[in-house]
UniProtKB/Swiss-Prot annotation:
UniProt xrefs under PANTHER family: THIOREDOXIN-LIKE PROTEIN 4A, THIOREDOXIN-LIKE PROTEN 4A, 4B
Residues bearing the modification Phosphoserine: 132
Any GO BP: RNA splicing, via transesterification reactions
Organism listed in the record: Homo sapiens
Name the UniProt record assigns to this protein: Thioredoxin-like protein 4A
Quaternary structure, from the entry: Component of the precatalytic spliceosome (spliceosome B complex). Component of the U5 snRNP complex. Component of the U4/U6-U5 tri-snRNP complex. The U4/U6-U5 tri-snRNP complex is a building block of the precatalytic spliceosome (spliceosome B complex). The U4/U6-U5 tri-snRNP complex is composed of the U4, U6 and U5 snRNAs and at least PRPF3, PRPF4, PRPF6, PRPF8, PRPF31, SNRNP200, TXNL4A, SNRNP40, SNRPB, SNRPD1, SNRPD2, SNRPD3, SNRPE, SNRPF, SNRPG, DDX23, CD2BP2, PPIH, SNU13, EFTUD2, SART1 and USP39, plus LSM2, LSM3, LSM4, LSM5, LSM6, LSM7 and LSM8. Directly interacts with CD2BP2.
Changes after translation: The disulfide bond seen in structures determined by X-ray crystallography and NMR is not essential for protein folding and function.
């Protein structure tokens, strides 16, 4: 599904996407289109893109094609989703200890919509860190 979502092909395009969006959250999936984890995540992102279009815009970035942010954002996972609002990285507390990003494939579409909505609401209030509506600290346990 990655071909259906807009790709950013260089660091300048990524910066412009983050800078130019005034009223919506910029959701960027860093990873590879061929990676199974990314494919799962892309399918979820594509399926919710229409639902969240009023408060979020979704982009994909290939970390091999655009290595500019790999060190800065510690993009070592096969699939990483990050949130930005008005040129500011919005952190999200998912209960996993890593508040910078989502580094696994979300399988539940509604959960992803809820997270993006929570990020949007918190960011509009000026918060740099928002708390996820669901705690993912036990996601690997059960």
């Amino acid at each position: 599904m990655s071909y259906m979502l807009p790709h950013l092909h260089n660091g300048w395009q990524v910066d412009q996407a983050i800078l130019s969006e005034e009223d919506r959250v910029v959701v960027i999936r860093f990873g590879h289109d061929w990676d199974p984890t990314c494919m799962k995540m892309d399918e979820v992102l594509y399926s919710i893109a229409e639902k969240v279009k009023n408060f979020a815009v979704i982009y994909l970035v290939d970390i091999t094609e655009v290595p500019d942010f790999n060190k800065m954002y510690e993009l070592y996972d096969p699939c990483t989703v990050m949130f930005f609002f008005r040129n500011k990285h919005i952190m999200i507390d998912l209960g996993t200890g890593n508040n910078n990003k989502i580094n696994w494939a979300m399988e539940d579409k509604q959960e992803m919509v809820d997270i993006i909505e929570t990020v949007y609401r918190g960011a509009r209030k000026g918060r740099g860190l928002v708390v996820s509506p669901k705690d993912y600290s036990t996601k690997y346990r059960y």
